[in-house]
Curated annotation (Swiss-Prot):
Top EC class for this record: translocase
Residues the entry annotates as binding ATP: 37-44
Protein name: Energy-coupling factor transporter ATP-binding protein EcfA
Chief place of localization: membrane
NCBIfam families: cbiO (TIGR01166)
C-alpha cells in the first residue's frame, strides 16, 4: 500500500485557470521521489495538496490508505504525518530565534516542555545546526535557513517530508549539502519528495521520478527510464543531465558507441569500459 497517492487530482484557481489536470501520483514508504518539471508546471500546487493546504477541485489525496478529510482535526493529523518545506525559507521562519521556530510545531501538539526541548535538540542535531538556538533566523545564510526550516518539520516527527525546490537560491556547495542531508534522512526511513528542475541532481539522489508539465504527469519511472526518453524530457522544456548529453553527442556526432550514463560516476565507468574495449 502506498503511503501517499493522488487519484485524478484536479485543481483550478478561483479565476478558472486549470493548474492541475488529473494528477495520479504514488509514493511508497521509504522512497526518495523527484517531481521534475519546468517553472509553472504545477509542482508547487501539487505539493500544497499533499498535506491539505489546498483542497482538490476534483479527485482525492490518499494518505496511508485513507482519503484526506478537510476538517481541522483531520488536517492536524495529516500535518503530523506530512511536513512541507517551502521553496523560500523566509515564508516558513517567523519566530525571533531558531529555537522558538523549531519548537513552534511541537508546542501546537500540546507536548510537554521536556518533550519539546528534546525534539528541538534532536532536530537541530539532525541538520547540523546545534549552537544556533539563540540566533535570529533572518541573520542566517540561505543554506542555514533551509536547514532550520527542515528542522522545524523534523520536530513534528513526520513520516513524509515534501520539499519545494530545496536547492533553489543556494550555491553549488550549499545545494550539495542539502541534498546529502535529505539523502541521510531518507536512509533513516523518512519518505522524501522533492520538486526540482535541476536535472543533474535527480539521477544522483532519486529512485523514482515523475515528469510534470502543464498540470499533467507525462511520464513516471526510474531516473534511467525518464532520461532515456530524451524526446519527452525536452518536450517539457527540460534537458538531459550534462554528462548524459555529452555521451549522447559522443554517440550521435562522433559515433563512439559509449554506453549511456546519467551520473558522473556511471559515465566514468562506461567511458573506462569503452577505452579498455578498443
Amino acid at each position: 500500500m502506498a503511503i501517499l497517492e493522488t487519484r485524478d487530482l484536479k485543481y483550478s484557481y478561483p479565476d478558472g485557470t486549470v493548474a492541475l489536470n488529473g494528477i495520479n501520483f504514488k509514493a511508497e514508504k521509504g522512497e526518495m521521489i523527484a517531481i521534475l518539471g519546468p517553472n509553472g508546471a504545477g509542482k508547487s500546487t501539487t505539493f500544497l495538496h499533499f498535506n491539505g493546504i489546498l483542497k482538490p477541485s476534483n479527485g482525492s489525496v490518499i494518505l496511508k490508505g485513507e482519503a484526506i478529510k478537510y476538517d481541522n482535526k483531520s488536517l492536524l493529523n495529516v500535518r503530523k504525518t506530512v511536513g512541507i518545506v517551502f521553496q523560500n525559507p523566509d515564508d516558513q521562519l517567523f519566530a525571533p530565534t531558531v529555537e522558538q521556530d523549531v519548537a513552534f510545531g511541537p508546542m501546537n501538539l500540546g507536548l510537554s516542555k521536556e518533550e519539546i526541548e528534546k525534539r528541538v535538540k534532536d532536530s537541530l542535531k539532525a541538520v547540523s545546526m546545534e549552537g544556533f538556538e539563540r540566533k535570529p533566523p533572518h541573520h542566517l545564510s540561505g543554506g542555514q535557513k533551509k536547514r532550520i526550516a527542515i528542522a522545524g518539520i523534523l520536530a513534528m516527527n513526520p513520516e513524509i517530508i515534501v520539499l519545494d525546490e530545496p536547492t533553489s537560491g543556494l550555491d553549488p556547495m550549499g545545494a550539495s549539502q542539502i541534498m546529502k542531508l535529505l539523502y541521510e534522512l531518507n536512509r533513516q526511513g523518512i519518505t522524501i519528495i522533492i520538486s526540482t528542475h535541476d536535472v543533474d541532481l535527480v539521477p544522483i539522489y532519486a529512485n523514482k521520478v515523475y515528469l510534470l508539465n502543464e498540470g499533467k504527469i507525462i511520464k513516471g519511472g526510474t531516473p534511467r527510464e525518464i532520461f532515456s526518453d530524451s524526446e519527452t524530457v525536452r518536450s517539457a522544456n527540460l534537458r538531459l543531465p550534462r554528462v548524459a548529453h555529452l555521451i549522447e553527442l559522443l554517440d550521435k556526432e562522433d559515433k563512439l558507441g559509449i554506453k549511456m550514463g546519467y551520473t558522473i560516476g556511471e559515465a566514468r565507468n562506461n567511458i573506462k569500459e569503452f577505452i579498455k574495449g578498443e
